Regions:
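Glycan-recognition and catalytic cores of secretory/periplasmic carbohydrate-active enzymes
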Residues: 1-206
């Protein structure tokens, strides 16, 4: 998660100052991250472990890739963001409830103690809906869905993605009562909801 946050911060610095050095460092960091932490079928939590990352690792890196694509239009970032999103939906989205889990449903079966912790989190159905010292992973993941819906839909292999907005709406609805009862703890979810409402308003004006 920290790597994704750092890359997004560098992109924000570039937007504010137009200093190309910030963008260059962000691009380099993203390339290193994809080289070191991205395995063929998962994002690992660190470069010294094969433990799969948690939802915040995926969501924040996906956000960083979308932020990079917004400023440099490199299609590689968008393709990788789609790859990350596909795994988020496959491994972290609980189909029955529409909520996002903090640990992947198909947790690693490795016998390390860290892997056991991951499996315990998955079996306990720890949801990622509330904010802590940074925005909650579910809110970021939902906002990523809404952003992806506004971008080119056809992937490199000619396929189109899922109905991103429908998934976002369902996930927000699943936490609707919690957002009403404790909006401060669900600020990132409310930010995602506000973005979704802006999308619906713009459709209505077309």
């Amino acid at each position: 998660a920290w790597n994704g946050m750092a890359i997004s911060s560098l992109v924000s610095a570039f937007r504010a100052t137009r200093n190309p050095k910030y963008l260059e460092v962000a691009q380099e960091a993203a390339n290193v991250l994809l080289l070191k932490l991205w395995l063929p079928d998962k994002l690992v939590h660190s470069d010294i472990s094969t433990q799969e990352g948690f939802l915040d690792d995926y969501a924040y890196v996906e956000k960083a890739l979308l932020d990079l694509y917004d400023v440099d239009k490199n299609p590689r970032w968008l393709e990788k963001a789609r790859d990350f999103n596909a795994l988020v939906l496959q491994r972290f989205l609980e189909q029955d409830s529409g909520k996002f889990l903090y640990a992947a449903r198909a947790a690693s079966s490795a016998s390390s103690s860290s892997s056991g912790s991951t499996q315990a989190l998955a079996s306990a159905k720890t949801y990622a809906t509330t904010d802590g010292t940074w925005p909650g992973a579910a809110g970021v993941a939902i906002e990523n869905l809404i952003r992806l819906d506004a971008l080119p839909k056809v992937a490199r292999d000619g396929t189109t993605g899922p109905d991103y907005l429908a998934i976002a709406r369902r996930s927000l609805a699943a936490s609707g009562r919690a957002m009403q009862e404790d909006p401060v703890a669900h600020a990132s979810m409310l930010v995602a909801l506000e973005r979704l409402l802006r999308v619906r308003t713009s459709f209505g004006q077309n």
